[in-house]
Structures are given as C-alpha cells and as structure tokens.
Amino acid sequence: AALTTAQVVALETRDLVALGTAAVRALNTADIVALTTAQVGALTTTQIAALTTGQVAALETADLVALGSSQLAAFTTAQIAALTTAQVGVIETRDLVALGTAAVRALETADIAALGSAQVAAFTTTQIAALTTAQVVALETRDLVALGTAAVRALNTADIVALTTSQVGALTTTQVAALTTSQIAALETTDVAALGSSQLAAFTTAQSAARTTSEVGALDTRDLVAVGTAAVRALET
C-alpha cells in the first residue's frame, strides 16, 4: 500500500502477477484506477477473485473490456454486485456468457437495464432461467425482443407473471409462438389485453387451448377476429 500510483503503473505485468492476494488487496482505489489495461488484463483469476468490492468498482471501463472470460468468471457474487452500470454495459458478450448463474443473479436491476440488446441476446438459456423476476422486469423492451425463442421458453412462469404489459406487448410474433402452454396460462389478463392482433394470430392451437377463461375474456373483439379457425376450435368450451 506504500507504493505510489506512479510506482504501481511502472510495475511490469510479470511482476504484477507475482503479487499475492494480500498484496493485491492492499492496492488502494487510486492505484486500481491508474493500472493500465495491459496490467489488468494480465491479472490471474486468483488475483481477480481477491479484489475488494471497492477495487472492482474502481476499475475503468477499458479495463473491464481487457478482462478475459476466465477472469470475469472468477468474480464473486459480491464483486459482480459491486460493478457499476457503466462497467456492466461494456462487458463483451463472450465474457458475459462465462458468468455462472449465481453471478448473473447478483447483477443489480440497474445493471440489467444497462445491458445492450446484443448482451441480453447472448445470455444462455441457463442464465435466462436463473434471472430473478425483478431482473426480468428490469429488461428493457428492446432487449427483451432480442431474445431467441429458446431463451423465451427458458423464462419460468413467475417471470411471465412479472412481465409488464409493455414487455408482453413488445414480444415478436415469433416469440409469442414459442411460448410454452404453461407460460401462456401464466399470462395476466392485462397482458393478454396488451397483445396485438398479429401476436394473437401467432398463437398455436395448443397455446389457444392453454388459455384460461379469464385470458379469453380479456381479448378484444378486434383481436378475436384475428384468431384462425383452428385456434378458435382449440378454445375449451
């Protein structure tokens, strides 16, 4: 900790990686800010995991970009939670998919909202399934529509219930057609009312049969006429 920031910056990467975890934790935030991208990129996974939450929050966005997938995967849940929205926003997709489910759940809702569409689309189905309902609600509509059909199907019923009417109304016809029957049954009546004619027309017969009576009752007449004959026949008596 007695090293000046100038001395820290002067450390060669081979010398920096030789530091023990206690020595790494002894670096103050000014030292962390001063580290070059080459120095940060050279840190071992053990050193990364040893960083304090204050040190993690002090990493510059360029330094986050310099981290590899294995380094990002070494972050603890506390470290992930300490990341700023600016830091989360620059994480490369190849590194984002390296995060474990616990790490994904540690992302704050503000961080989820800060993610770009490409980042959200890169999430694996396992990561999507691990999201909390609060995180799912925090997804911006433009990011939600970037999800592939497998990712949409990975949302659990609690997530579907938690979706806002704006989010449901923004789903593409392809995404709507990919919903499981359990997900369809979990849609709230206000969400069903938010669906447009083209979205309702995308429902499969199995999905139509899975609708609850409350959901059917929430359909607008203009949307009902968009439903195909097979879908109408699938409605339970």
Q: What are these model-predicted stretches?
A:
Residues 1-237:
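General marker for long, soluble alpha-helical cores
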